[in-house]
């Protein structure tokens, strides 16, 4: 379904942004603490966007199941692969964010 592809692309964009901002926050933490805090906050906001978009994907899949039954197996496999990859990205970002908070 095209809408799921669009939403998963948006999720990946948000994840990439969150990672970029978290890395920059770590890079500037010592010399520019105010900037680093701002970048960290932007990173956490991007992760909130990821969660909101994921909730929308879940809702679309649920609506499809109610109206048409299970999605085709190939589509489900692709979505699961993308979802697992996104979960791994989110874990790495949370590690970066944790390093910022603890460091």
What are these regions (language model features)?
Residues 1-103:
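Non-heme di-metal
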């Amino acid at each position: 379904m095209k809408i799921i592809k669009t939403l998963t692309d948006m999720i990946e964009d948000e994840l990439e942004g969150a990672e970029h901002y978290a890395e920059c926050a770590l890079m500037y933490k010592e010399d520019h603490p105010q900037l680093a805090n701002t970048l960290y906050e932007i990173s956490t906001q991007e992760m909130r966007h990821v969660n909101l978009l994921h909730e929308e994907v879940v809702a679309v899949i649920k609506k499809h199941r109610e109206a048409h039954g299970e999605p085709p197996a190939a589509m489900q496999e692709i979505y699961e692969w993308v979802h697992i990859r996104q979960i791994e990205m989110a874990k790495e970002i949370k590690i970066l964010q944790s390093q910022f908070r603890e460091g």
